[in-house]
A protein has these predicted regions:
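Core dinuclear metal-dependent hydrolase active-site scaffold
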Residues: 1-66, 126-129
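Binuclear metal-ion centers of metallo-dependent hydrolases, dominated by the metallo-beta-lactamase
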Residues: 1-6, 87, 91-129
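Active-site environment of divalent metal-dependent phosphoester hydrolases
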Residues: 5-8, 22, 57-61, 78-83, ...
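Short, glycine/charged-enriched secondary-structure capping and boundary segments
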Residues: 29-30, 57, 65-68, 85-89, ...
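Proline-rich intrinsically disordered, low-complexity coils
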Residues: 31-37, 78, 83, 95, ...
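Broad hydrophobic/π-residue packing in well-ordered secondary structure
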Residues: 41-43, 51-52, 79, 103-106, ...
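Short glycine/proline-enriched coil/turn segments at helix->beta-strand junctions
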Residues: 46-48, 66-69, 94, 119-120
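Proline-aspartate-enriched helix->loop->beta-strand connector
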Residues: 68-73, 77-100
């Protein structure tokens, strides 16, 4: 699917959300993930909307999402988001449940602390080891 495409496959509505880097770059200012080829997806299952972000940062397209029940956001430096970027994205589109993933050595409790006042966002941490 191309950035922005929407398809229905076997009863599931799938929306392609551009996934790319804005801040984190390779040497020479080349993004780890340039805009264009990569997507995250919003998948609608009956009345539930799930966002799986892919390898991305807190892009304007992500921050404009609406009515997300569950979000999976990457938190892996230098390729994706810092805990602060994940918190910024979550505060913008307000998923009911947030699972950080891909976080490797980043302490997920940093994200929990950043969102502790966001009472309508439940952060769920799973052991990645």
């Amino acid at each position: 699917m191309q950035n922005g495409d929407v398809r229905t496959i076997q009863g599931l509505k799938i929306e392609a959300v551009p996934a790319y880097n804005i801040v984190h770059m390779r040497s020479g200012r080349t993004p780890f993930h340039p805009k264009g080829p990569g997507n995250g997806y919003v998948i609608t299952f009956a009345d539930k909307r799930v966002h799986v972000a892919g390898d991305t940062e807190n892009t304007p397209e992500m921050k404009r999402l609406k009515n997300i029940d569950i979000a999976f956001l990457p938190m892996n430096l230098p390729y994706t988001m810092t805990p602060q970027m994940v918190a910024d994205a979550a505060k913008a589109f307000k998923p009911k449940i947030l699972y950080p993933y891909h976080y490797g050595q980043t302490d997920p409790n940093m994200l929990v602390n950043l969102l502790k006042r966001s009472k309508n966002i439940e952060v769920r941490i799973r052991n990645m080891r």
